[in-house]
Amino acid sequence: MRLILLGAPGAGKGTQAAFICRKYGIPQISTGDMLRAAVKAGTEMGLAAKKVMDAGGLVSDDIIIGLVKERILQDDCANGFLFDGFPRTIPQAEAMKAAGVKLDLVLEIDVPSEAIIERMSGRRSHPASGRTYHVKFNPPKVDGVDDVTGEPLVQRDDDKEETVRKRLEVYQAQTRPLVDYYSAWAATGDAAAPRYAKIEGLGTVEEITARALAALG
């Protein structure tokens, strides 16, 4: 199973990715992990990436695609792989297609923006213990304080509504077009095109997992 998981920040991709990878015995590949591993291993592509990063630049799509091709030839990808957060843009998707990277499925987890904002902006945490709460879905016994210590809970900057809205705007502008790109390619009937499936990301984790498994076939 070679697949791409698409969805906005906070759509629950991480939870589903972990489940799919365990079930199929495939690695979850993110560009960040891939870059770090290649730099550490000192591969040709890794050294090229390090040079750019050390200079404070953005690693080019050419280098990223080179790393992808290198990574999916490794033994742990024999049964497939799951791309998490990649490709991010149409040029990356086009470059992957041109490089002949074979895909079986593009799976989109669809959650309305307002539901994501509610989901993320409602998170609260107790920094010392790592305990997490949600003002609506998993509230503490006493509003604003940790159940165990009685210490105040905090809202991470990443979870503030304004930040969440900005991240969603970036997703809509950059990554959302990939949904149209892959669904249009699948509709052409091209033998090289991956299947495209969309599942609803609202409900319990178990319900969403069941939908994901049905889509994976």
UniProtKB/Swiss-Prot annotation:
GO terms for cellular component: cytoplasm. It is found in: Cytoplasm. AMP binds at T31, R36, G57, L58, V59, G85, F86, P87, R88, Q92, R156, R167. The keyword GTP-binding does not apply. It catalyses: AMP + ATP = 2 ADP. One of its GO terms (biological process) is AMP salvage. The keyword Kinase applies. Residues 30-59 are annotated as: NMP. Pathway: Purine metabolism; AMP biosynthesis via salvage pathway; AMP from ADP: step 1/1. GO terms for molecular function: adenylate kinase activity; ATP binding. Residues 122-159 are annotated as: LID. ATP binds at G10, A11, G12, K13, G14, T15, R123, T132, Y133, G203. Its EC number is 2.7.4.3. InterPro entries: Adenyl_kin_sub, Adenylat/UMP-CMP_kin, Adenylat_kinase_CS, Adenylate_kinase_lid-dom, P-loop_NTPase. Belongs to the adenylate kinase family. Monomer. HAMAP family: Adenylate_kinase_Adk. Catalyzes the reversible transfer of the terminal phosphate group between ATP and AMP. Plays an important role in cellular energy homeostasis and in adenine nucleotide metabolism. Consists of three domains, a large central CORE domain and two small peripheral domains, NMPbind and LID, which undergo movements during catalysis. The LID domain closes over the site of phosphoryl transfer upon ATP binding. Assembling and dissambling the active center during each catalytic cycle provides an effective means to prevent ATP hydrolysis. This is Adenylate kinase. It comes from Leptothrix cholodnii (strain ATCC 51168 / LMG 8142 / SP-6) (Leptothrix discophora (strain SP-6)). The lineage of its organism: Bacteria, Pseudomonadati, Pseudomonadota, Betaproteobacteria, Burkholderiales. The gene is adk.
